[in-house]
Amino acid sequence: MNIFEELKARGLVFQTTDEQALVKALTEGQVSYYTGYDPTADSLHLGHLVAILTSRRLQLAGHKPYALVGGATGLIGDPSFKDAERSLQTKETVLEWSDKIKGQLSTFLDFENGDNKAELVNNYDWFSQISFIDFLRDVGKYFTVNYMMSKDSVKKRIETGISYTEFAYQIMQGYDFYELNDKHNVTLQIGGSDQWGNMTAGTELLRKKADKTGHVMTVPLITDSTGKKFGKSEGNAVWLDADKTSPYEMYQFWLNVMDDDAVRFLKIFTFLFLDEIAEIETQFNAARHERLAQKTLAREVVTLVHGEEAYKQALNITEQLFAGNIKNLSANELKQGLSNVPNYHVQSEDSLNLVDMLVTAGISPSKRQAREDVQNGAIYINGDRVQDLDYQLSNDDKIDDQLTVIRRGKKKYAVLTY
């Protein structure tokens, strides 16, 4: 199985400009290719991971990746299938975000070894050297307005309005391809399927300006089995930055993937061999309640993104919380595992009587209910049941001198911080 056949088998090929020619190029020698990442935030997220891992698969097959950080295009904003104009960021912010994204990409691509080691480029380096007049003369003249208006990504915005700034974005992305081809002999661009219009602007410019053929391959935008856009948890992006989405939260995200998606995602997001995945699928279908596919997915992706120690910690947090063993976890581990539960910062004037604190922290709705909860054995401090109405919270209840975990019943948690 050649690399293109493997990508297809994993569900990673959505569209290509000329499949036969691309397969020929990939099987006959080393291909230099690029994927672009606009710094629209200070971290990449799971939505980017499909293209990143596809790039890594091609590198493992001997081809040479260029990771383009859009320091210039990030200042403009990509209109592709967006309902409204993006807010423009300052140059300083985009530069800072660009540096962070560069660091994240080095986790996945090999920038150090072999003749196909990855290269980092930033399109601000060339766009900052081009005057507006030169850009119109040397690039703009190759694009008709009719051609630009025909792009689906632009059509969607015509009714609501699109600025010239965003309208020109596709020409800038097209010029990226031309520049990388001219300087580095890059002949293939990889990106999400929503980028097709912008990406083919590059092949058009290559053909008209340099009389060369470039290839485009898009990866699918991943949705779950209900059609919902993938990569968000409770409406929020799942970030690759551990400070924005902890390894535990990422672990839980994968653990909760629906059965109908789990095996497909193993093909897309892991480097397990396809025959290994087929074996996992057989075991998974025989006992879905054991969630083997989801557990494997969580292990592989968290290890890939954050390392084996982070995976082991996420697994330990999961197991200890499930068992109610609060005291077996550090304060930092509890902050990860209980990041979504109510948090109350204890004030110096607060009563430390347990009944009072249950009401103050919003755990019980009233003192009467709080007393009943304590007497009925429904209240736990750091996993231990407390039934003393006169119980006073003390330093002994602080884990690592930072927090106390209170549970009401089986599932209602609250964290007291000091």
Swiss-Prot record:
The keyword Cytoplasm applies. InterPro entries: aa-tRNA-synth_I_CS, aa-tRNA-synth_Ic, Rossmann-like_a/b/a_fold, S4_RNA-bd, S4_RNA-bd_sf, SYY-like_C, Tyr-tRNA-ligase, Tyr-tRNA-ligase_bac-type. Its main location: cytoplasm. PANTHER family: TYROSINE--TRNA LIGASE, MITOCHONDRIAL, TYROSYL-TRNA SYNTHETASE. It is found in: Cytoplasm. A motif ('HIGH' region) lies at residues 39-48. A motif ('KMSKS' region) lies at residues 229-233. It catalyses: tRNA(Tyr) + L-tyrosine + ATP = L-tyrosyl-tRNA(Tyr) + AMP + diphosphate + H(+). This is Tyrosine--tRNA ligase. It comes from the Bacteria. GO terms for cellular component: cytosol. Residues 352-418 form the S4 RNA-binding domain. Pfam families: SYY_C-terminal, tRNA-synt_1b. Belongs to the class-I aminoacyl-tRNA synthetase family. TyrS type 1 subfamily. SMART domains: S4 (SM00363). Catalyzes the attachment of tyrosine to tRNA(Tyr) in a two-step reaction: tyrosine is first activated by ATP to form Tyr-AMP and then transferred to the acceptor end of tRNA(Tyr). HAMAP family: Tyr_tRNA_synth_type1 (MF_02006). Signal peptide: none annotated. Keywords: Aminoacyl-tRNA synthetase, ATP-binding, Cytoplasm, Ligase, Nucleotide-binding, Protein biosynthesis, RNA-binding. CDD domains: S4, TyrRS_core. ATP binds at K232. Homodimer. L-tyrosine binds at Y34, Y169, Q173. SUPFAM superfamilies: Alpha-L RNA-binding motif, Nucleotidylyl transferase.
